Structures are given as C-alpha cells and as structure tokens.
C-alpha cells in the first residue's frame, strides 16, 4: 500500500513537473515573443523615424523650391521689374541655393540645378540629392527675360511720354521774326505783347538799341495784334476839320475846269479837291459812277446813307442818276448836320443849277436833304 502510494505520488509529481515545464516554456515563449516584438517595434520606429526625418528634409527642400517658384511667379506677375539673381534659403538641416548670376549674361540660356544637401544627425553618411528642375529653370528664364523687356518698355514709355509731353504740352512758344527797316525792339515787343528785356534775354542782345535789318529774332508765339489806331481827340478832329474847311474856302466863288471840257462841271470841282489830296483825279463817265469806277481801298472809305449817318467836312457826296439828267451829281460836304436834326447837310457845289457848262455858275454853298440813295466817300487824308 505504501509502494502504491509512492508510485501514485511520483506520477502526480511528474505530471505537475510537466505542467510547470509547460508553463515555463509558454512563459519563455511569450517573453521571447514580447522581446522580439519589442525589438522589432523599436527597430521599426527607428527606421520609421529616420525615414520621416529624411522625408521631412526632402519635403522641406521641396517646399522651399515651391516657395522660390511662387515668389518668382509673384514677382513676374506683379512688378516684373526686379528679380534677385542671388539668393539663399537656409534651414538647420536643409539649404536651398539659387544662383542666377549667369542666367542672363550674354543672353545664354539658363541651365540651373537645385542641390538639396541632407545630412541627418543620426546618420554617419551624408546623402546628396540633386534635382534638375527644368520647370523652375524655365520660369526663372522667362521671368528674367520679361524683367528685361519690362525695364526696356518702361524706359521706352518714359522716353515716349517725355517726347509726347514735349510735343503737345511743352511745344516751343516762340517764332522767328525778321527785322525790317525801321523796326525797334520796343515796337516789336509791343506787336508781340512782350517786353524789350524778354526779347533781349531770349536772343542774347546786349544793346537793345542795336539791331540789324534781316536779323532773326525769337518772339512769342502769340497772335499778331496790330496796335489799335490812335483815336483822334475832339481837338485834333476840330483842327483837321478846320484845315479842310480852310482849304475848301479857297475853292469857293471860283469856277473850276479840271479836264478842260464842258465848262465848270461838278465833277471838275471834286477832281480839283481829290488831286490836292492824292495827286490824281477820279474816274467815271458820270458823277454817279465815282464809287464804282475807282479803287478807294488805300484812300477812302465808302458809306451808304442811313437815318443815323452824319457826313463830315471833306466827305464827297454822290447823288444817284435821279439827278443831273441821269449822270448824277457830286459835291464836297461842309456841314453834316446843318439843321441839327440830321435831315440836311451843307456842301460846296458846282453846276447844281446847270450853269456850269456856260461857265456861269461858280463853286458855291448849297443845302441838301439827305436822300436814301446817296453815297458818301470819306478820304483818309485831310486837306
């Protein structure tokens, strides 16, 4: 019984040992697996971290590359007038360097590489990655060329604007005047609405009293306005009228035959007076033709009678064909407002009463009514 008991105990102990051994094996296995997984996980994390570091470095370089491209594009799209030919973008682990010094020299094409240097702290060996960025090279080339063109256009634009401004807003304000006989600087200055000193300074004239015939002077580009004729004062006008009346008084009470034909005609008296003023007689088949047969542009002014017209002493009055048997009549005015109502005037006449052809009617004073068809000729000269 004892033996049996011991045998049974031995068997039970053996079974318990197997169980413990199995548990130990399982524990060791689990531990080994755990250690293996731990080791595997640690290596994976390290590799993954290292890979991330490398990826970060590369990504950082790529982002800098993109940033450089975008910056160039921004410059191209906005200013297009300045591109930095030398620049460096640096980080702690990555350097991105763009060298464009030779990009536009001698018109050579740009062939530029971007070098990214990657040297992780935990790596004993540096890895160099060279990227041939043709797209960025092309962008830089275009940007540089466009910058050159833009600068050239700006230069041309400024030049064109300058000449346009000169042509349209700063055009020369002077013209050339040729000095004529009798000219003086003061007279020229008056004619062109400027001053003698201004003409002197413009033409470098030291002595304002010394100019020469044919000399070219720069004068202001202003419309020529001739000086207004001096108005004759009432005193001067009275003196002129007095001198005319004094001369006409010498013709009164005498018979005049200017052409030697048909006696003392009205036309003869007027021709004597006009010859005294201008040295020649007047043309016309009859007295009524005088205003149309002669050129009075430089000698007199012609007036047609109106209700407000007033003749002056020395004016010629021409009657229409209603008088003188169709030939008209002419006389020399002495008083243009004889009645004070502008209804009558007084003149010096000859042959008014048809006695001149017989030389029986001398020049004498006659009062006439103003007629609608009368014409008056006022000489510029006074007797």
Swiss-Prot record:
GO terms for molecular function: hydrolase activity; lytic endotransglycosylase activity. Residues 175-219 form the LysM domain. Keywords: Cell wall biogenesis/degradation, Hydrolase, Secreted, Signal. The keyword Signal applies. InterPro entries: CHAP_dom, LysM_dom, LysM_dom_sf, Papain-like_cys_pep_sf, YSIRK_signal_dom. GO terms for cellular component: extracellular region. Residues 1-49 form the signal peptide. Its EC number is 3.-.-.-. CDD domains: LysM. Induction: Repressed by MgrA. It is found in: Secreted. Residues 241-378 form the Peptidase C51 domain. Pfam families: CHAP, LysM. GO terms for biological process: cell wall organization. PROSITE patterns: CHAP, LYSM. Probably involved in peptidoglycan hydrolysis. PANTHER family: LYSM DOMAIN-CONTAINING GPI-ANCHORED PROTEIN 2, MEMBRANE-BOUND LYTIC MUREIN TRANSGLYCOSYLASE D. This is Probable cell wall hydrolase LytN. It comes from Staphylococcus aureus (strain NCTC 8325 / PS 47). The gene is lytN.
């Amino acid at each position: 019984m004892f033996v049996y008991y011991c045998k049974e105990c031995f068997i039970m102990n053996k079974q318990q040992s197997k169980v413990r051994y199995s548990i130990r094996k399982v524990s060791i296995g689990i531990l080994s697996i755990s250690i293996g997984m731990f080791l595997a996980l640690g290596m994976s994390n390290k590799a993954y971290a290292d890979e991330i570091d490398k990826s970060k470095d590369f990504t950082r370089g790529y982002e800098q590359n993109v940033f450089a491209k975008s910056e160039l594009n921004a410059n191209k799209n906005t200013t297009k007038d300045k591109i930095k030919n030398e620049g460096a973008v640096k980080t702690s682990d990555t350097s991105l360097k763009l060298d464009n010094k030779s990009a536009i020299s001698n018109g050579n094409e740009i062939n530029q590489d971007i070098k990214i240097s990657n040297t992780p702290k935990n790596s004993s060996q540096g890895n160099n990655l060279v990227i041939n960025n043709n797209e960025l090279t092309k962008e830089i080339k275009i940007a540089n060329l466009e910058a050159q063109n833009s600068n050239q256009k700006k230069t041309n634009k400024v030049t064109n604007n300058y000449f346009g401004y000169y042509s349209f807003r700063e055009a020369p304000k002077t013209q050339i005047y040729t000095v004529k006989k009798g000219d003086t600087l003061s007279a020229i200055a008056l004619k062109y609405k400027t001053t003698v000193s201004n003409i002197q300074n413009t033409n470098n004239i030291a002595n304002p009293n010394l100019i020469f015939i044919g000399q070219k002077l720069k004068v202001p580009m202003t419309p020529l306005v001739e000086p207004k004729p001096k108005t004759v004062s009432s005193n001067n006008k009275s003196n002129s009228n007095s001198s005319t009346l004094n001369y006409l008084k010498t013709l009164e009470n005498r018979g005049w035959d200017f052409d030697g034909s048909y006696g003392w005609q009205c036309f003869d008296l007027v021709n004597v007076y006009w010859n005294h003023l201008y040295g020649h007689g007047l043309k016309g088949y009859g007295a009524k033709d005088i205003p149309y047969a002669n050129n009075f542009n430089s000698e007199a002014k012609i007036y047609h009678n109106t209700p407000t017209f007033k003749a002056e002493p020395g004016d010629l009055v021409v009657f229409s064909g209603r008088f003188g048997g169709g030939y008209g009549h002419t006389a020399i005015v002495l008083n243009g407002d004889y009645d004070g109502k502008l209804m009558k005037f007084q003149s010096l006449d000859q042959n008014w009463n048809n006695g001149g052809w017989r030389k029986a009617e001398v020049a004498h004073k006659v009062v006439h009514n103003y007629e609608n068809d009368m014409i008056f000729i006022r000489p510029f000269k006074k007797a």
